[in-house]
């Protein structure tokens, strides 16, 4: 009875809203709420991570190697993996990829548990030293908040997709205090279309989350950065070279990440993954303690250090402590091994994103580039802290294929607006370098291979939004190879189609098709009814469409074969139905009209 009362109360609230608040106004209210809830989620996650890290590492001696680095990461990914397998019982890795999939294939619907599951799993993972970032989990959390808040009020799927974007924008703005970057990330990475009806809700969520973050944690930028030397135009060639270097580092990170995760994917037992990932991660963190956690302390150090004495503290707690002459080699090895630490964290059962690793790698890459040049006098002096800042924008732009996000995020993170021009040069150079080798970002490449990626290309976007099950027609009469012509004629009489799929009677496998035009000249000659069987009359289909094919691939198959109807089969070759051009065009028009409404 109480459930029915709650249900009717919710229905009354929805009806009151529909009668008294216009939808556009209500979307603005929802975007404001999404911004508040997402910022609170970001604050909770950051607090959770810092409490665990401080409790575990506050008593470490900086002059000695700490063997607990061999233990903490394994404990973290074990606890996170156990939580995901036994409590959540769903895959919550690759948060941004899941959001892209929800937008393109699930009409903006994200499972409710993502509101809290990513916070707990990533908090444990990173707090215990997992070498990943908290940003992708909080972006998934924010998007889940937007999606489920919209679902509660029965909003249509276009609005759900917008609220998913609002959650992502609020997450970036809240965790980084970067409202512009939050908006740009949503447009550039999540491919949310920029229209007047979408811009205002995204801005409201982003500004609301950033404001709440300012109120609770102060108005200072996330990283302190003081520009000691203004940017000189004669350094532009070196800035371009840094961008190219960052693009190559991004390519290495992307390719290596996919390769190592592929190795973990082939391990079918979660405890094998834990053992493999745990050993790899703990050994790497023991040798290179800066790989512990998000790595923001290292970024802070390189952005503010001015001498070798300060930079050397990056080797604290390691077996390399005191070897100042090995600093450059030490940092280069971190660039090399960071991707393995991040992959081992996620592959072993942990939960985290690649935002922080991208910033971390970029900062070290920029520092190494300038420090190496200064040590060997390849050029005029290149300020290490300036190039470390620019490197952050370069690697982020390359890994995410998002140059604008890289520029605005780094500027807002550090207050480094005086370096806006070189930030843009580095970001564009890095982006142009990586797209020459890798056309899709680390987030989108998995979906792009399956034809499930929504882009700003309207035609491709509409095809992506279309679903195979909505265009498959199943009112075709099937025939079997052992049937004679007389039985085939009876089947023809009961159908209004001119094509007949031939299937195996026991397995349902598609063997071929019979076209009405091919038998029209003999179908009324009764003396031939027992002479011919379907196996002699059938022909091969021009091509087969698989239920797993994307609509863009389906359209390409139609163009290649010049056919009007094509059979659809599952992965085992069993007949499912037919797809026709006319059905696709009708469905395309319906989706286009709905998709284009502003």
Cite the ranges covered by each PLM segment.
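Alpha-helical transmembrane segments and immediately membrane-proximal extracytoplasmic
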Residues: 1-475, 479-506, 510-511, 565, ...
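ATP/adenylate-binding site constellation spanning eukaryotic-like Ser/Thr protein kinases
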Residues: 205, 426, 473, 516, ...
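Short aromatic/basic micro-patch
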Residues: 462-465, 513, 544, 578
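Structural signal for short hydrophobic segments within the conserved structured cores
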Residues: 475-479, 536, 541-544
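The conserved cystathionine-beta-synthase
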Residues: 479-497, 502-504, 523-526, 544-564, ...
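Short hydrophobic beta-strand motif reused across regulatory alpha/beta modules
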Residues: 512-519, 577-584
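Nucleotide-binding motor/catalytic cores of P-loop/tubulin-like NTPases across gene-expression machines
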Residues: 516, 531-534, 553, 563
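Conserved Rossmann-like nucleotide-cofactor binding loop
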Residues: 574
């Amino acid at each position: 009875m109480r459930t029915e009362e709650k249900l009717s109360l919710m229905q009354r609230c929805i009806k009151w809203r529909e009668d008294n608040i216009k939808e556009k106004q209500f979307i603005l209210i929802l975007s404001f709420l999404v911004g508040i809830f997402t910022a609170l989620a970001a604050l909770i996650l950051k607090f959770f991570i810092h409490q665990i890290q401080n409790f575990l590492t506050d008593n470490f001696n900086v002059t000695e190697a700490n063997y607990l680095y061999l233990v903490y990461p394994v404990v973290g990914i074990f606890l996170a993996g156990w939580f995901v397998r036994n409590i959540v019982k769903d895959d919550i890795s690759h948060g941004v990829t899941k959001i892209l999939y929800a937008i393109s294939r699930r009409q903006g619907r994200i499972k409710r548990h993502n509101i809290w599951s990513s916070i707990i799993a990533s908090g444990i993972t990173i707090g215990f030293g997992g070498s990943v970032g908290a940003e992708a989990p909080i972006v998934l959390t924010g998007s889940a908040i937007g999606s489920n808040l919209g679902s509660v009020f029965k909003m249509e799927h276009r609005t759900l997709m917008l609220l998913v974007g609002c959650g992502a924008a609020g997450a970036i703005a809240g965790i980084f205090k970067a409202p512009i970057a939050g908006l740009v990330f949503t447009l550039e990475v999540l491919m949310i279309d920029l229209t007047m009806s979408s811009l205002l809700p995204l801005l409201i969520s982003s500004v609301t989350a950033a404001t709440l973050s300012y109120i609770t944690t102060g108005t200072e930028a996330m990283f302190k950065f003081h520009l000691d030397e203004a940017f000189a135009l004669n350094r532009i060639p070196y800035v371009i070279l840094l961008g190219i270097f960052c693009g190559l580092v991004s390519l290495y990170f992307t390719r290596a990440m996919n390769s190592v995760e592929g190795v973990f994917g082939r391990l079918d037992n979660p405890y094998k993954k834990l053992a493999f990932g745990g050993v790899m991660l703990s050994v790497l963190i023991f040798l290179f303690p800066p790989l512990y956690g998000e790595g923001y302390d290292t970024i802070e150090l390189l952005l503010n250090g001015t001498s070798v004495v300060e930079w050397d503290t990056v080797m604290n707690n390691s077996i390399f402590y005191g070897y100042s002459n090995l600093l450059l080699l030490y940092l280069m090895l971190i660039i090399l091994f960071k991707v393995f630490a991040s992959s081992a964290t996620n592959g072993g059962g942990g939960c985290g994103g690649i935002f922080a690793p991208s910033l971390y790698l970029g900062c070290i890459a920029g520092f190494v580039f300038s420090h190496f040049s200064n040590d060997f006098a390849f050029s005029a002096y290149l300020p290490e802290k300036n190039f470390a800042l620019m490197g952050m924008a370069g690697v982020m732009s390359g890994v995410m294929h998002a140059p604008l996000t890289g520029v605005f995020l780094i500027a807002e993170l550090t207050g480094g607006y005086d370096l806006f021009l070189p930030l843009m040069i580095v970001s564009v150079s890095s982006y142009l370098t990586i797209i020459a080798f890798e056309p899709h970002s680390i987030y989108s490449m998995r979906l792009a291979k399956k034809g499930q990626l929504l882009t700003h290309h309207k035609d491709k976007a509409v095809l992506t939004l279309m679903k195979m099950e909505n265009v498959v027609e199943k009112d075709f009469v099937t025939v079997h190879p052992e049937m004679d012509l007389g039985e085939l004629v009876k089947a023809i009489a009961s159908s209004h189609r001119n094509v007949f799929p031939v299937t195996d009677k026991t397995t349902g496998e598609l063997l071929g098709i019979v076209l009405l035009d091919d038998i029209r000249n003999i179908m009324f000659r009764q003396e031939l009814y027992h002479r011919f069987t379907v196996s002699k009359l059938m022909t091969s289909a021009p091509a087969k469409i698989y239920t797993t094919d994307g609509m863009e691939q389906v359209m390409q198959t139609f163009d290649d074969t010049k056919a009007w109807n094509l059979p659809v089969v599952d992965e085992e070759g069993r007949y499912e139905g037919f797809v026709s051009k006319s059905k696709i065009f009708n469905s395309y028009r319906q989706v286009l009209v709905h998709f284009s409404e502003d």
